[in-house]
A protein has these predicted regions:
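Acidic/polar active-site rim loop that often engages polyanionic ligands
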Residues: 24-27, 143-153, 225-226, 245
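NAD(P)-dependent Rossmann-like dehydrogenase/reductase catalytic/cofactor-binding core
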Residues: 2, 25, 164, 171-180, ...
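Rossmann-fold dinucleotide-binding core
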Residues: 112-183, 190
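NAD(P)+-binding Rossmann beta1-loop-alpha1 motif at the extreme N-terminus of oxidoreductases
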Residues: 1-49, 56
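Rossmann-like NAD(P)-binding element
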Residues: 52-112, 120
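Structural/interface elements that position substrates and couple domains in central-metabolism enzymes
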Residues: 189, 193-199, 225
Length: 289
């Protein structure tokens, strides 16, 4: 039967995207956030995105049918019937640990608990639960409705059938699983992408090339749909910083240490599109100036 009910914790860019692709796949979704306003905005964003997919002929169902599968919740216990709970909050290990402890308490013993973390070790999150064998990583990429890959990460205690269920779920929602068999900092894709991003930031700081020209070069010469800095603004500079910092703290490897330019941007509040300014500047509607 596959996964029938999913609880998504966090209604930001990633959480709302995960909720959307689950609903589009026929799964009942309980979208949790402590902030009611955030949930309202998330539903509006999801509705707009679903509408665009329908306009392009990529979805057979109507918007109302898909949106009816998403239920907003502000109490944890309202998600207790989930077959799978996916945590999708920002990269703060203490917050994630707290969420995993609460999920472990309220969810059925058979419920799988996953994190969308891009860098924090799954093993550390599993350790605060009484079901480490049923904990895994499901790392989606932004924007979730558009990106096809999902990393399925095994922690040290993750059971084989849990990883297999994670793989099946990814296929169920129309994505492609990337199986990560060891719980290393940054998993697979970020360990490949981050060195390029760090070098790009260093080149800007050294005055070798501009943000615009580096992004243009990557689009035209490397076949990327978006440049490194365009992607960074969409994801959020604070998210990138948090992921790099987590990888550095986990591994002790200085190559993952967030570059000075990124650290300064984050301290200044230039967090990307959501803040109106990051590597680029944005209008109120999110379009680039």
């Amino acid at each position: 039967m596959g996964i029938q009910k999913v609880m998504v914790i966090g209604s930001g860019l990633m959480g709302s995207g995960i909720a959307q692709v689950c609903a589009q796949a026929g799964i009942q979704v309980m979208l949790y956030d402590v902030a009611k306003d955030a949930l309202v905005n998330a539903i509006k964003s999801i509705g707009w995105s679903v509408g665009k997919f329908i306009e392009k002929g990529k979805l057979a169902e109507d918007q109302d049918t898909i949106m009816a599968r998403i239920r907003r919740i502000t109490e944890f216990h309202d998600g207790k019937e989930a077959d799978l709970a996916i945590e999708a909050v920002f990269e703060n290990i203490e917050l994630k640990r707290e969420i995993f402890q609460r999920l472990d308490t309220i969810c059925h013993p058979k419920t799988l608990i996953a994190s969308n973390t891009s860098a924090i070790p799954i093993t550390e999150l599993a350790a605060v639960t009484n079901r480490p064998g049923k904990v895994l990583g499901l790392h989606f990429f932004s924007p979730v409705p558009m990106m096809q890959a999902v990393e399925v990460i095994k922690g040290a205690a993750t059971q084989d059938d849990t990883a297999a269920a994670g793989k099946d779920f990814v296929l169920q929602i129309g994505k492609e699983p990337i199986m990560v068999n060891r719980d290393v900092a940054g998993f697979v894709i970020n360990r490949i992408n981050f060195p390029s991003a760090i070098e790009a930031m260093n080149l800007v700081e050294q005055g070798v090339a501009s943000v615009e020209d580096i992004d243009k070069g990557l689009r035209l010469a490397a076949g990327r749909r978006m440049g490194i800095f365009e992607t960074g603004d969409m994801v959020g500079l604070d998210v990138t910083y948090g992921a790099m910092k987590a990888m550095y703290e986990e591994s002790g490897d200085p190559r993952w240490y967030p570059p000075l330019l990124l650290r300064r941007k984050v301290k200044a509040g230039h967090l990307g599109r959501k803040a109106g300014k990051g590597w680029y500047e944005y209008n109120e509607d999110g379009s680039r100036k």
